[in-house]
Amino acid sequence: MENMKPKIILTGDRPTGKLHVGHYAGSLKRRVELQNSGEYDKIFIMIADAQALTDNADNPAKIRDNIMEVALDYLSVGIDPAKSNIFIQSHVAELTELTFYYMNLVTVSRLQRNPTVKAEIQMRNFETSIPMGFFNYPISQAADITAFKATTVPVGEDQLPMLEQTKEIVHKFNSVYGETLVDPEILLPSNKACLRLPGIDGKAKMSKSLGNCIYLSESEADVKKKVMSMFTDPDHIRIEDPGKLEGNTVFTYLDAFSNEGHFAEYLPEYTNLDELKDHYKRGGLGDVKVKKFLNNVLQEELSPIRARRAGYEKNIEGVYEILKKGSEVAAETAAQTLSEVKAAMKINYFDDPAFLEEQIQKFNE
């Protein structure tokens, strides 16, 4: 019987700050489900510090300060180091060498057309002076994905162009040098509300600088305070006024987090979210009541995360060892892929006895 290709996941986050409920709804919760599904042979989770430096080169302390924060967030949401290999990107030198070889397979104009790159450049005001490392990061990402032979890459919809770039590099490499790299598939979130949660102020994106995030590590009191200050329908002034759902942050969060069990527990006069929405739209339902319900929903989700984090915070040496061992395993895996890439490109001169034989024959003729 023909051997099936191992199912391997690669995913990760930039350590530019603590992780928040947007990360949790958009990717972390799904990662834990995938990890525990038993469907995957290997899972690699990368703390992408080298990638974070592409737009934080003048502030490496920011990255250094958040390595452990992100690791603690991973462990607190249920990432299990016995099932998922957590590693630090900069400690896998093979990724840089792979990036260097892949750069020869992509044109500058192709990178410029990448919609994700264009959007990120605009967001960071890099239009006139784009750091080369930042401009190059779709190629770096292709190295990350292919180094671990990832078959599945769970990402948000906004990252689709990035994965398309990776697939193009894989196809180009394999067509030029022979079948070597694994062609990955994207795995999108199933719940559309999870694709990108807005900030609590209604802004399109949660951002540490805007102060509109709910962090996974925040206290119960701080979470409640932020929920009660959330942006809703500005025209819903009196309880009897009909309310709008579009752009109403509270309902966006309920879409992402609530289920019928929450209604039975905290708001039994409604069976499900559709009933609550209908009441809000026709009027007679106040924002405070809806916010209190959302607070209960979020506290139920975040309480075990806080408890696990408190335990890991008492054993930072243990977390350090998880990262160190994970990075060693990742480097071994990437080294094997790099060896195969160099063999395919025929630049493995000292590992290939045929090279010396060819040269001896050439110069003895």
Regions found by a protein language model. Name each.
Residues 87, 153, 355:
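Residue-level "edge-of-site" marker
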Residues 161, 167-365:
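Conserved nucleotide- and phosphate/pyrophosphate-binding catalytic cores
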Residues 19-28, 43-44, 49, 58-63, ...:
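Structured ligand/cofactor/substrate-binding pocket environments in proteins
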Residues 11-13, 88, 149, 199, ...:
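Pocket-edge structural micro-motifs
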Residues 14, 51-52, 148-153, 211, ...:
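A broad detector of the eukaryotic-type serine/threonine protein kinase catalytic domain
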